[in-house]
Amino acid sequence: MTKIFKIPPICLGNNNFIHVIEIQTIDQDFGNFINEKIRLITEGSTDTEIPKIKKRLCEFLQRKKGTTIEMGAVAEFMVHLYMNENGFKQEFVFFNLEERSIKKGFDGYYTINDEEWILESKSGTISTSGISHKSKLLEAYSDLEKKVKDSEGNNPWRNAYNHACHRPVESAEDIIKNLKTLAEDFDSGVYKKIENLNLLPATTIFLEGNWNNIDQIALLTDIKTALTTKKFKGINILCIHNKSLELLENFLTT
C-alpha cells in the first residue's frame, strides 16, 4: 500500500524524533488506509463491518459537534492512524469500554521493539491566540506529568490495564502484567517518574480551511527550546497540521 504520511522524521538525537504530519485532504489512498485501520483503532480485532464502524464514529463526532471533544477525537484518531502506519502496536481501543465515548486516562498506550509509550494529544484551531506546536507540546508534557503523579485523582495505568485486558486488543501477557503492577503501585502511592517513561506528545493545529505547511526549521528551534528542561526516557513528538476539522467526518459520510 502507498505510504500515507510521507514526511521523514526529524532526529533530535538519542533516538528521539519530531514527526511532521500534514493532512491537507483525504484522497483515495488515505481513505483506503482509514478503511483498513478504523476497525483496529476503534474496536481491536473484531469482525464488525466497516460501514457500521464508520457510522458509529461519525455519529459520535456529530453528537459532539462544535465542542473540544469533537476536536480532540479527530486529532487523536489521526494520531492513531500515524502510529499504526509506523509500526506501533496499539494496546487499547479508541472508544471507552463502558460507554459511547472516547477512552479516558492516557490518550494512547503503545508498544514497539519491547518499549512502551504513553500518548497525550493536544489540539486547537489556528485562530486561537498564541497557539503553536511549542505551546501545545508544553501543555501535553504538563498533563502527562500530572497524570503519572496522581495530580488528577485518576489512575491512568488502571485504565490502560483494563484496555489491554480487553480480548480484541490482543495485548501480550507481559504487557498486561506490567500494567497491572503499575496500576497497583499507583494505588499504593508509588508513582512512575516521568524521566523513566517514553513519551508521545502530539500537537494538532486545525487550519480552518486555509492551508499552510509546517515551517520545519522554526519548529525544530521551538521544540529544542521547549525540551531544554524536560525529562523523559525517550520522546517522539507528533506535530500535525490538519486543514479542516470536517475532513474526517466528510469522509465517514461518503
Predicted segments — roles?
Residues M1-A73, F77:
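Interdomain/boundary linker segments immediately adjacent to catalytic/signaling cores
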Residues E70-F77, Y82, G87, I112-N113:
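A short mid-domain helix/strand-loop element embedded in enzyme catalytic domains
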Residues H80, E85-K103:
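A short acidic/basic microdomain associated with nuclease active sites
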Residues I102-G105, I112:
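A short, glycine/Asx- and small/polar-enriched loop/turn
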Residues Y110-I118:
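Active-site beta-strand-loop-beta-strand hairpin of nuclease catalytic cores
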Residues S123-L207:
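Catalytic cores of nucleic-acid endonucleases
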Residues N196-F232:
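C-terminal structured domain segments
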Residues A218-T254:
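Charge-rich, low-complexity intrinsically disordered segments
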